Swiss-Prot record:
Protein name (record): RNA polymerase sigma-54 factor
Annotated spans, Disordered: 52-91, 114-133, 493-514
Disulfide bonds: none
Keyword Transcription tagged: yes
GO MF annotations in UniProt: DNA binding; DNA-binding transcription activator activity; nucleotidyltransferase activity; sigma factor activity
Motif (RPON box): 480-488
GO aspect biological process, one term: DNA-templated transcription initiation
A cellular component term, taken from the record's GO annotations: DNA-directed RNA polymerase complex
Gene: rpoN
Family, similarity comment: Belongs to the sigma-54 factor family.
Length: 514
């Protein structure tokens, strides 16, 4: 059969991800901080979008000039602002007397002063402002001292300790390689090669930096950091150095090996360990840490007067934007070219979709949160031990949504409950079968039970993983030993052997102190 080109029509249906749908899906999974940043960017990009302003309170209403105007005196003195115009030629003291206020404490000592220039005649010309340059509004934050970073603190000490420009240049490069915790994370040979210096020169400058405050800064390891702090206290003797060289034994609480290596008895070893515990393993964190964002819940859950749970959105985390229809009508009349009309139409469509997407996002979050609260009512009342097994499909089926939508909604979202501020993902937990064939247990509740059992153990009766399995079975929880070990390790709880050593060491310390 000969092949020949031909045309034919075919009708079919398919799902297409439009830009608007992609935008709505993206908004669902954003955290409240990411959402604010996204909306701010849209406000900058789209001229038809504007913030929905809050109604002004009565105290912010503009004053009534008739009510504010003072009663003119009978002596024929100038009224309204005439007194200022007539007194511009007088001295500053006269103006301060007329104002009946002290201008000396309006700003802090380092704030910009009033600009006083030479005027005509014998008077002075005073340019009154709000305290900021160019007549800007007074901003108290402008007078706050800038936070001193660790690098700033070290560079200030370097300028005093190293007058030689070449050594100071080496020091500045080394300080740039010290992280926020105070540790030197660079390579001395690489710095020496970059600056054309010798390894000994760079190492010598690093030793100078290690003598700066905070004590322990510039160390290349934990043992060196602790040793620097102990040297400043003149407490780094050979026995203490031997202990610092074997911190892994200290982490395993192997005190018998430490006593043998350090050549000390149990009492001296306990004193040495106590001294190490009083040191700062991250000395740099005292200076200018990174910005810490507060954890702001997206949903509030509180108990109503009738015993039911009230679920509310946190309005502070919801950006409010509007489409400026008045401005759109104005610029639409002025649009002439096809390009301008297309741009305006795209802006209007994008703005409308954004406002609808924000509204839909808020409704979806509230719907999902309400169902989570309904499913986990026992947890809110009684605590973690009553957390139910819950998966995305259960919530999705209950509210008539796809489980991928529920997954996006619960990402990076937090609920404020009587049990604390919790991530929405916390409420979704896999199930552990019941040994008696009853209701399954949530994995998070089982973790909490394991932690409670371990916290209640004594030094003479440390629970092994096998013992934990048996105790959980007595509570009706059918769980394997490897699962107990996995849950224990996920909570950073050491093994029974290590816990026994730790508890015995603590008991020895208490006996020595007594």
């Amino acid at each position: 059969m000969a092949m020949s080109p031909k045309m034919e029509f075919r009708q079919s249906q398919s799902l297409v991800m439009t830009p608007q749908l992609m935008q709505a899906i993206k908004l669902l999974q954003l955290s409240n901080l990411e959402l604010v940043a996204y909306v701010e960017a849209e406000l900058e990009r789209n001229p038809l979008l504007e913030r929905a302003s809050e109604p002004e309170s009565p105290e912010h209403d503009p004053p009534n000039p008739q009510e504010e105007a003072p009663t003119p005196p009978d002596s024929g003195a100038p009224v309204s602002g005439d007194w200022m115009e007539s007194d511009m030629g007088s001295s500053r003291e006269a103006i301060e007397t007329r104002l009946d206020t002290d201008l000396g404490n309006v700003f802090p000592d380092d704030a910009p002063a009033e600009r006083i220039g030479a005027g005509s005649g014998s008077g002075s010309s005073i340019e009154w402002g709000s305290g900021g340059d160019r007549g800007e509004d007074y901003n108290p934050e402008a007078f706050l001292a800038a936070e001193t970073t660790l690098a700033d603190h070290l560079e200030a000490q370097l300028s005093v300790a190293e007058p030689d420009p070449a050594r100071r240049l080496i020091g500045l490069n080394l300080i740039g390689l010290i992280d926020e915790t105070g540790y030197f994370s660079g390579d001395l040979d690489a710095v020496a090669e970059q600056l054309g210096a010798t390894h000994d020169q760079v190492a010598d400058v690093l030793r100078v930096i290690q003598s700066f405050e905070p004590s322990g800064v510039g160390a290349r390891s934990l043992s060196e950091c602790l040793a620097l702090q102990l040297r400043d206290k003149d407490r780094c003797d050979p026995a203490m150095q031997a202990l610092l060289d074997n911190l892994e034994l200290l982490a395993r609480h192997d005190r018998n090996a430490l006593k043998r290596i350090c050549g000390v008895d149990a009492e001296d070893l306990a004193d040495m360990i106590g001294e190490i515990r009083r040191l700062d393993p991250k000395p740099g964190l005292a200076y200018g840490g990174g910005v810490v964002h507060p954890l702001v819940p997206d949903v509030f859950v509180r108990e109503g007067s009738d015993g039911s749970w009230i679920v509310e959105l946190n309005s502070e985390t919801l950006p409010r934007v509007l489409v400026n229809q008045t401005y759109h009508a104005t610029v639409a009349k002025a649009a002439r070219s096809a390009e301008e009309k297309t741009f305006l139409a795209d802006c209007l469509q994008s703005a409308s979709w954004l406002t609808r997407s924000l509204d839909q996002r808020a409704r979806t979050i509230l719907k999902v949160a309400s169902e989570i609260v309904r499913q986990q009512d026992a947890f809110l009342v009684h605590g973690v031990r009553h957390l139910r097994p819950l998966n995305l499909r259960t919530v999705a089926d209950a509210i008539g949504m796809h489980e991928s939508t529920v997954s996006r909604v619960t990402s990076n979202k937090y609920i404020s409950t009587p049990r604390g501020v919790l991530e929405m993902k916390f409420f979704f937990s896999s199930s552990i079968a019941s040994s008696g064939g009853g209701e399954a247990h949530a994995a998070e509740a089982v973790r909490h039970r394991i932690k409670s059992l371990i916290e209640a153990e004594s030094a003479d009766d440390v629970l092994s993983d096998d013992t934990l399995v048996q105790k959980l079975k007595d509570d009706g929880i059918d769980i394997a030993r490897r699962t107990v070990a996995k849950y224990r390790e996920s909570m950073n709880i050491p093994s029974s052997v290590q816990r026994r050593r730790e508890k015995q060491a603590l008991r020895s310390d208490a006996a020595a102190a007594g």
